[in-house]
Amino acid sequence: MKKQGSPSNPAPVLPALPEPLKDLKIKYTKIFINNEWHDSVSGKKFEVFNPANEEKICEVAEGDKADIDKAVKAARKAFELGSPWRTMDASERGRLLNKLADLVERDRLTLATMEAIDGGKLFSTAYLMDLGACIKTIRYCAGWADKIHGRTVPMDGNFFTFTRHEPVGVCGQIIPWNFPLVMFIWKIAPALCCGNTVVVKPAEQTPLSALYMGSLIKEAGFPPGVVNIVPGFGPTAGAAISHHMDIDKVSFTGSTEVGKLIKEAAGKTNLKRVTLELGGKSPNIIFADADLDEAAEFAHIGLFYHQGQCCIAGSRIFVEEPIYDEFVRRSIERAKKYTLGDPLLPGVQQGPQIDKEQFQKILDLIESGKKEGAKLECGGGPWGNKGYFIQPTVFSNVTDDMRIAKEEIFGPVQQIMKFKTIDEVIKRANNTTYGLAAAVFTKDIDKALTFASALQAGTVWVNCYSAFSAQCPFGGFKMSGNGRELGEYGLQEYTEVKTVTIKIPQKNS
């Protein structure tokens, strides 16, 4: 076993890192409905590519509206009153989830290798962090399965009143490409814990780990129709979920632009419940009294983790004037140390962007930063001859009106801005349509508490960044989304509260 982390903030002990599988065989490329594998109704398939070398991995069945209809029918049948799933003890649902966690742990190496090949994620990150988080999240939800219950209510009059926390029903779940397996688990685990059935659409760029999970869900013993997985494209399969009249809830992680379309579709159809985890442009505020070593390192990781492809990336770094130049110097030095390459190889610290579209978007935003007057300190262009690699890029002298300071870049591009006063930086930090996360680095508890309450964000970190746990709710303010995932709050998103009142002859206290 080995430890990772700084002396002042050590990370938990992590398992030893094995070598990735050298010859990964892709077994599951069809649509998963009713615990069975199906070709798409149309017979269409789409290609899946490795972003590190642009080579085709395989072809996957392309689901569309007809396949979503099939999956919803299966999920609805599994949710019927009297079905094996609806009559199952809550503790048994928890046992099945724990069994699923055991299987994920057993196949951790396969899934981590798949995430690296399919999504360009560093194998070390996938194995140690992503798979570790998946297993913990499943077990956390498993533990809650028989602890979700209502209350008795002291209603006036001769009545006995209680509440029931019932599953919402059939849940459509649309998964992003940046954390395909983690987001799959974030969505299915609480839904199943509460007794719902699900129809999942993984991102077309990264469908492989979700399909592999279908095999584990069947092996764990979940009844047919409880989990259905339909790979496909947003405008077809995703839109079919959003507009479906027999889906009771949709949960989506992705761009704010698509989130708006999903909420609009819900409003135009059956007013299905909607949980949205959308974009961000998160402020990270560094005061002169902060521990500069830790602040610079957390700011670096908070931006460059997974090639900057994180919704919570600390992409607006505000540094107090007295330490600005030194902070910029350290940031440049840190970025220049990166080793880019095949995410399966040991020693590689940055992999590729997910696809050509994202690659070009990031390069265009870098060019806009140059044209608008930001100082390019390092990086600024593509890397290598093959794959969608971009050099770690640092800009200084960034102003709030520049595109790179306003738009979500979703790439390895760090923007460093200067501030003088507390009131000024609070206003600037909140001057955005987003509100997903924020951080402040200071040794002054009064400053920390001031910012914890003043910053308009669903998560505020103090003297750390990207600290996540299955117990902690996560979600956005403003246009970064609605609702919460993880923690007890996340479970509440998957239940409906019903009030039951019974007339009785006499009520006694």
From Swiss-Prot:
Main subcellular location of this protein, as a coarse class: cytoplasm
A Pfam family that the UniProt record links to this protein: Aldedh
Catalytic activity, as annotated: an aldehyde + NAD(+) + H2O = a carboxylate + NADH + 2 H(+); all-trans-retinal + NAD(+) + H2O = all-trans-retinoate + NADH + 2 H(+); 9-cis-retinal + NAD(+) + H2O = 9-cis-retinoate + NADH + 2 H(+); 11-cis-retinal + NAD(+) + H2O = 11-cis-retinoate + NADH + 2 H(+)
Binding residues annotated for NAD(+), in chain numbering: 175-178, 201-204, 234-235, 254-255, 277-279, 357-361, 408-410
EC number, as in UniProt: 1.2.1.19, 1.2.1.28, 1.2.1.3, 1.2.1.36
Keyword entries, A-Z: Cell projection, Cytoplasm, Lipid metabolism, NAD, Oxidoreductase
One of the GO BP terms on file: cellular detoxification of aldehyde
GO molecular function term, any single one: aldehyde dehydrogenase (NAD+) activity
Record bears the keyword ATP-binding: no
Catalytic residues as annotated in Swiss-Prot or TrEMBL: E277 (proton acceptor), C311 (nucleophile)
Protein origin, superkingdom: Eukaryota
Localization: Cytoplasm, Cytosol; Cell projection, Axon
GO CC annotation, single: cytosol
Record-marked site positions (Transition state stabilizer): N178
Pathway assigned in UniProt: Cofactor metabolism; retinol metabolism
Family according to the record: Belongs to the aldehyde dehydrogenase family.
Record function comment: Cytosolic dehydrogenase that catalyzes the irreversible oxidation of a wide range of aldehydes to their corresponding carboxylic acid. Functions downstream of retinol dehydrogenases and catalyzes the oxidation of retinaldehyde into retinoic acid, the second step in the oxidation of retinol/vitamin A into retinoic acid. This pathway is crucial to control the levels of retinol and retinoic acid, two important molecules which excess can be teratogenic and cytotoxic.
Summary of subunit composition and partner proteins: Homotetramer.
The protein, known as: Aldehyde dehydrogenase 1A1
